[in-house]
């Protein structure tokens, strides 16, 4: 059940990313977390890698309450850094998301 739930969530997040409802970083953090709950094939492990790499590259950026407490100027600076990092991964993230919307649900 956990494997199936994680796979369905990955599919939903990948779809939301392709529809631009999430940033690459937000999708990467969520997919990287969920990928640890999936019994993955070799091919799926390769698809998850780019999401894990982007999540690690942006892990220092505060989220949720920690983000809310930042000064406006700090948020702007971190957003610029995030978009610069995302640009390096974007092509691979988009291609990975395209693959993950078809992830096997069994």
What do the predicted segments below correspond to?
Residues 1-106:
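Acidic, Ser/Pro/Thr-rich low-complexity regulatory regions
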């Amino acid at each position: 059940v956990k494997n199936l739930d994680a796979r369905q969530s990955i599919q939903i997040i990948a779809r939301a990313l392709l529809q631009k409802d999430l940033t690459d970083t937000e999708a990467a953090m969520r997919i990287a977390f969920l990928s640890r709950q999936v019994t993955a094939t070799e091919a799926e492990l390769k698809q998850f890698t780019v999401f894990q790499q982007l999540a690690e590259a942006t892990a220092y950026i505060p989220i949720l309450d920690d983000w809310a407490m930042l000064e406006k100027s700090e948020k702007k600076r971190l957003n610029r850094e995030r978009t610069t990092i995302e640009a390096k991964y974007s092509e691979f993230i988009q291609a990975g998301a395209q693959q993950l919307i078809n992830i096997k649900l069994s």
